[in-house]
């Protein structure tokens, strides 16, 4: 699990580009692996349009490594963290984006899960990415996948892990935080908190019920009926419960009241808020800054020019 240095002369943007080309060229094989996971009731049908969206997003990123910012009396430089441990549920989209972002930022990444969800699909995708790494003479162990029953020993004893990402609901996040002696960054991706005052579009209700992970809060007196919905007296109670229980990722409100919409937006504590709309299922939000440590350099501008040739913002 040791962190491997990557040659500074390697064009990581080209590595990422080649990785996406490799994935697209192997589309038929990936589909076959995906069908095995689906047949085993151990996965979802992969949408290659989502993978193309990740490609477009990453290709727009200019090489952020060693980027220098002029911050008044000091200069701040991006440097790689080392090894990032990502504890997640096996979602292939997360694996692709996080693996390639770790390469882009010159980090190594260990994916850890206590379930083998999407196992055939994920293993094949990692093999394809590792093939590209070897083409550039980069250690293929830069990206690893581990299955463990418990995270405690991994997180409490490893001195080679520099940061932990955890993707899951609030309870899962808390479990990892307790077990870890390392800095933990939490993501509540694809966990939605929904408050319904009223909703007229039947198609939205049908789509809402297809969301994998959501808590639905319905205002008292509503004619709507959902399995396992939570009844609340008003918007204040809904916001209070959401803020207490939320994983912090996304919340949704359905209402025809401008006041309620505004009140919800201003008071609910989630990163993404949808008003009378549903997410598209690909709201990945892995901030690239989380893959770096910031180094402060204190010196005169003249010396900074010598160090970086005036190439800083």
Regions found by a protein language model. Give the residues of each.
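Short, well-ordered beta-strand elements within core beta-sheets of diverse protein domains
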Residues: 2-5, 226-234, 248-253
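C-terminal segments
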Residues: 15-18, 25, 32, 49, ...
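ALDH superfamily catalytic-core signature
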Residues: 18, 22-26, 104, 130-135, ...
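Short, structured coil segments at secondary-structure junctions
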Residues: 105, 160, 179-180, 268-269
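Short hydrophobic alpha-helical runs that function as membrane-insertion/retention elements
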Residues: 108-112, 165-166, 184-186, 193, ...
């Amino acid at each position: 699990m040791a962190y491997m240095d990557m040659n500074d002369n390697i064009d990581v943007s080209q590595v990422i580009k080649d990785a996406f080309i490799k994935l697209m060229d192997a589309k038929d094989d990936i589909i076959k692996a995906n069908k095995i996971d689906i047949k085993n009731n151990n996965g979802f049908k992969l949408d290659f349009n989502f993978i193309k969206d990740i490609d477009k997003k990453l290709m727009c990123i200019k090489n952020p490594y060693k980027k220098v910012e002029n911050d008044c009396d000091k200069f701040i430089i991006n440097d790689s963290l080392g090894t990032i441990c990502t504890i997640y549920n096996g979602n292939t989209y997360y694996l692709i984006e996080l693996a390639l972002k770790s390469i882009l930022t010159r980090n190594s990444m260990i994916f850890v899960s206590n379930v083998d969800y999407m196992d055939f699909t994920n293993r094949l995708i990692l093999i394809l990415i590792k093939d590209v790494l070897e083409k550039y003479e980069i250690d293929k162990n830069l990206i690893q996948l581990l299955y463990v029953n418990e995270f405690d020993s991994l997180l409490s004893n490893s001195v080679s892990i520099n940061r932990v990402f955890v993707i899951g609901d609030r309870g899962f996040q808390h479990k990892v935080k307790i077990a870890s002696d390392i800095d933990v960054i939490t993501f509540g991706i694809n966990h939605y908190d929904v408050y319904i005052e009223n909703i007229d579009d039947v198609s939205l209700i049908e789509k809402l019920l297809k969301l994998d992970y959501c808590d639905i809060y319905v205002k008292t007196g509503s004619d709507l009926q959902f399995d396992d919905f939570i009844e609340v007296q008003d918007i204040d109670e809904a916001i209070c419960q959401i803020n207490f229980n939320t994983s912090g990722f996304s919340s949704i409100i359905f209402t025809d009241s401008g006041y309620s919409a505004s009140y919800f937006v201003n008071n609910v504590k989630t990163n993404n808020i949808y008003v009378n709309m549903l997410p598209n299922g690909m709201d990945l939000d892995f901030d690239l800054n989380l893959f770096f440590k910031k180094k402060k350099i204190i010196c005169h501008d003249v010396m900074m020019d010598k160090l970086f040739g005036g190439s800083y913002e």
